[in-house]
Amino acid sequence: MADEIAKAQVARPGGDTIFGKIIRKEIPAKIIYEDDQCLAFHDISPQAPTHFLVIPKKYISQISAAEDDDESLLGHLMIVGKKCAADLGLKKGYRMVVNEGSDGGQSVYHVHLHVLGGRQMNWPPG
């Protein structure tokens, strides 16, 4: 977790990201789901027994940079997250998280929805 905080403190919006490379299939990922709008894949540093990301194929650096016309796309990410959670057997529940900016723990500046499950989640999360 400390490693992710350190990454978030130095990460900045702009430029190509690892997620862009995954979308273009330049680097491998354990893909769970793909359609014309988004991609879901397992996190390389899981924070729960099941931890995957859902990302839009359209580049949006962070939620605060989203436009009104991104509303449907952002909602689609949540629906895909729900469907993937069901497909992965997360019947007892799961958590969906979007990190925003350095204080929010955002380490990659390409909007992404974390879906975590497979254990009891703690509250408060941070």
Swiss-Prot record:
The modification N6-acetyllysine is found at residues 21, 30. GO terms for biological process: intrinsic apoptotic signaling pathway by p53 class mediator; protein desumoylation; proteolysis; purine ribonucleotide catabolic process; regulation of DNA-templated transcription. Belongs to the HINT family. The modification N-acetylalanine is found at residue 2. Signal peptide: none annotated. The keyword Nucleotide-binding applies. A motif (Histidine triad motif) lies at residues 110-114. This is Adenosine 5'-monophosphoramidase HINT1. InterPro entries: Histidine_triad_CS, Histidine_triad_HIT, HIT-like, HIT-like_sf. Homodimer. Interacts with CDK7. Interacts with RUVBL1 and RUVBL2 and is associated with the LEF1/TCF1-CTNNB1 complex and with a KAT5 histone acetyltransferase complex. Identified in a complex with MITF and CTNNB1. Interacts with CDC34 and RBX1, and is part of a SCF (SKP2-CUL1-F-box protein) E3 ubiquitin-protein ligase complex. Interacts with SUMO1, SUMO2 and RGS17. Interacts with the Ten-1 ICD form of TENM1. Interacts with CALM1; interaction increases in the presence of calcium ions. GO terms for molecular function: adenosine 5'-monophosphoramidase activity; deSUMOylase activity; hydrolase activity; nucleotide binding. Its main location: cytoplasm. AMP binds at residues 43-44, 99, 105-107, 112-114. GO terms for cellular component: cytoplasm; histone deacetylase complex; nucleus. It is found in: Cytoplasm; Nucleus. Keywords: Acetylation, Apoptosis, Cytoplasm, Hydrolase, Nucleotide-binding, Nucleus, Phosphoprotein, Protease, Thiol protease, Transcription, Transcription regulation, Ubl conjugation pathway.
